[in-house]
Each structure stands twice: as structure tokens, then as C-alpha cells.
Amino acid sequence: MHIPVLVEEVIEYLNPQPGENFVDGTCGAAGHTLAILEKNYPDGKVMCFDWDSESLDRAKKIVGDKEGNLLERTIFINDSYANLKKNTVENNFGPINGILVDLGFSSDQLGASGRGFSFLKDEPLDMRYSQSNDLPAREIINHWQKDEIEKIIKEYGEEPWARKISEAIVSFRKVKTILTTKELLNVIAAAIPQKLQHARIHFATRTFQALRIAVNDELGNLQRFLPAAVDVLSDGGRLAVISFHSLEDRIVKNFFREQVKAEQGKILTKKPIIAGEAEIQVNPRSRSAKLRVFKKA
């Protein structure tokens, strides 16, 4: 079961009040959405985005199983948060008092998704959140040039062995098309020295992360989302972003600084908010989470 991170901190900074409207750009298992709905009762609404239709269906069930009018106060959108403005306009949703995105990867998707998000299960190399996306991971692995593969593994995965891994991929695919997570895992293992394969972070983690980011254009979506979020926010509205790796955090930090320079608002978190030891004990993945919050002028 996916456990949402930094829920208390998110609620503290978004400060939902009765009747206010919010956007949860990454619905997942609806953990943050439910926390907001508890605070903006009785008639505040949440617009809840998820590009993954399976995740959105799970969220609908979770919200629907709760007592009260939560389901009728939630608008579910099967789309990327990058298309925030389009969807808020089409649904005449507003005024918007706060927006949240949690850029972490849902642990529910690491289960038997059948889409190859995890190297712990042997599944087809797909990694698409949405089937409307026409770039599965196998396309990158089997058809992109070596330099292109090396670039995404190095930049998106921050993997020091990116060159060796990309060389191994290109060498292996000449013999056999790489179609499953297990096949890719074996190729990565062949490229990394044995002595480095028992580190705290699994040796395939960075490569799989890089592929997932590339397949779903995660950094591009974030860069499109941020200005749209500030645009649709009401004056005094708050934008909260939870990131899990340095690439995302850098984009958010720099964007917030640019907004301050342009006198569009102020940063409420001088330093990113991180999880306390108690939360990390219950949910180890929260160790990597960083929350930054911006308030529109």
C-alpha cells in the first residue's frame, strides 16, 4: 500500500480552509487528497490528476469508500498535471487556493503493473504511465543511439556507469532484442563491476529511474506545470512541490527563485522541508522527500 509523505507538513503549509478549492496534481492513492478534503469540508473541492488510469481508478475507490460527501467534492482527471490549465478551464474549476504535486513514484506501481516499472519483477519493458504515450522503454533501449541512451542514464539517473551500461545495451541488442525487465537487469549487471553490485542502492535503480523519466517526459512535464500552476492560483494561493531527486528539486528551487525576482510571490520554505525520523521509520522512502512551498502575491 502506498503511504503518502509529509502529509502533516503539506497541510500546515497549504492551510486548507472550509470552502476552499485545491488541486492534487499527483493523486496516487489519494492520501494527500483525503487530508485536504478533511480540512476544506463541507463544500471545498479537490481536482485530482493522475495520468495512470489504473491509479486513478484506485483513488476513486479509496475516496468513495470514505464516509461523507468526499466523492462528490472530488473531480478526477485522467491526464498529466502538465495539462493543469486546460483542465481547470474546461471544468470551470476555481478559485484555486492551493496546488500540490508529489513527484515521487507510487509504490502501488511497483507491484504487478505489467508495465516494467520495477526490476524486482520480470515484466515487459514499457514504463508508460499512460497508453496514450507512444514511447515505451523498449523503444529507447532497442532503437536509440548509444550516445542518446548514455545521456539519459547519466543525466536522469545520475549513474556513473552510464557509458558502460549504454555500451552493454547496444552490444546485447545486436544479438537479441531486449524486451523484458529481467533481460535489461542482466545487461546492466554485465556492465557494472561485481564488487559494486551490493551497495545500499540496487545497481539497476538509477538506470530504471532514468528510463522512466525519459519515457514519461517527467522533467519536461514539471517545467510546463510550474508556470501554469502559478498562473491559475488565486492571489495568496500556495504551490507545494514534493521532489525525490536532485534534478526535480533543482528545477523547483530555481523556478521559485525566478518567481520571487519577478515579484510574483514569496518562498515559504527557506530550506526544503524533510521528513522526521518517526516518519522515516514508518515509511523509508520519505527519507528522500523534499517539500518546497511558494505563495503567490
Show where each model-derived region lies.
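S-adenosyl-L-methionine-dependent methyltransferase catalytic core, i.e., the SAM/SAH-binding region
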Residues: M1-A297
